[in-house]
């Protein structure tokens, strides 16, 4: 007999998950301890049997990894029980199978029987008095329907109970192969350690263990585990999405941050058209909001231009700099956000807008573009705001094909004066006032910088929007946005490159990852770029390559002798350095600056540690069939040097465990 008390079940599941989490922490600590011995260098631990001992600890690390995977499966299982019960509609149920199968089933039959007997008895009575007072017999249709529904619910509840029970038992058993494998695999490891007096790590036979039939099944077990954990993660996300979608149905959009987080979890494609539009507005401004705080005053003081003109136009058209002032924390993101916001506002107010919105959009766009609100030095280069004559000329040109429009423009001096007044009001602010406002950024909320915030009560400006080429205006705004980007680097008094602000990296297209500094081609700061081979590089705020991730391919790429001979010059390259490729050209690695760093010639050339490591990778790729080689290279720098101090390389060949190699950028590595 089954009894389901969900409250107790969930309480027990929570406790078990907590216990497994504590066990996992212990396993992680054990793994760290084992790995610290396995990774000891020759200078720290060498001599007779040292390699065997380190291999012994290394393979124990693999066993702890298996235990951690097993524990993760258990945690995922116990954490999913609440969702499984909710999916069956049993989230707060108390069910006794015996009661449903017997007492309630019997009650159903008895109720039908009683009603049938009562109806028969009543029919006999009515027949007896029919000649005196004819009456219709009462209908049992409603009763029968309700009784049938109740019985159907009883049966479905039993089915749900059985299904939940079977699902949980089946899923719980999925981790049993892991447990059996771990025990058998560990047994083989013990056997490889020796027997009797020789059963010590110094006699450990790593080859015997790693080539055992049991250990070779490790890859299959890992794939099963990975697939299970992926499914559990997707299930949890789907349940959360359904809950959030239900919440958003009647959401009042009052809290932009809360809406954004919910919508991001749900996924853009699962939002309604209205929700997608609101989400896009938040997305276009959210990433810059963090940059407004903290870095704003510092950037202004160091000579960077304040974001006033174009950013103010996009996020708060018709408003003033008193409402929003910021600074360029990340040039690439600044342009992307501004450009996207321009596109959003164009689609919203020109393509899909009404008379009011089109007039407002064109009036501000014309005023912005024609009066050169954005200069070439930076967003804040707005000392000259243009004249009404320029506005008139531009609008006349746009409307030259329309006599009606021409007439409308001729009489729109009041409109142009209105535009000029609005523009001037937003620009003629002293540096002292801008700095004061930057210090007040702490009070800024995300809602304040959304396009067309409702607090701005703008009247239709009267610009003849029907005679203006909106697409041209939009493209003009976006072009102006692109030229505002400040130079990514400065130059110190000693001639060294000064860094950009430290911000999260952004992804750029390959080919758009270069910048200029002191007339030299350099990499942009804080970016991620990917080659056509799929090799992914990341730079820091100095524009130095800090990491490369790649699934290597055999092939040949062109070398660039100039790039190799100039890497790290003039200050940081050493006399015995080469221009070393992080990904060798034999693996289709780029021959340009985007893959080259100053590297000690001894480690880079034949016989060196870097060279030998590359040969190992090439050998694996040349096998039949070729093995997969995955590499993760990190370049570690000191101070502002453009020359790596050392390299930390993790690589895996085929299904083997990752190997970690540290190579110092010096002779001998």
Swiss-Prot record:
This is Toxin YeeF. Optimum temperature is 37 degrees Celsius for the C-terminal fragment DNase. GO terms for molecular function: DNA binding; nuclease activity; toxin activity. In the N-terminal section; belongs to the LXG family. The lineage of its organism: Bacteria, Bacillati, Bacillota, Bacilli, Bacillales. Optimum pH is 5.5 for the C-terminal fragment DNase. The gene is yeeF. Toxic component of an LXG toxin-immunity module. These modules promote kin selection, mediate competition in biofilms, and drive spatial segregation of different strains, indicating that LXG toxins may help avoid warfare between strains in biofilms. The C-terminus (residues 527 to 669) has DNase activity in E.coli and in vitro, and inhibits growth upon expression in E.coli; does not have RNase activity. Acts on supercoiled, genomic, linear and nicked DNA. By 2 hours post-induction cells have an irregular surface, membrane disruption and elongate. Keywords: Cell membrane, DNA-binding, Hydrolase, Membrane, Nuclease, Toxin. The C-terminal fragment is a homodimer. The C-terminus interacts with cognate immunity protein YezG, probably with 2:2 stoichiometry. The second YezG molecules binds with lower affinity. PROSITE patterns: LXG (PS51756). It comes from Bacillus spizizenii (strain ATCC 23059 / NRRL B-14472 / W23) (Bacillus subtilis subsp. spizizenii). Signal peptide: none annotated.
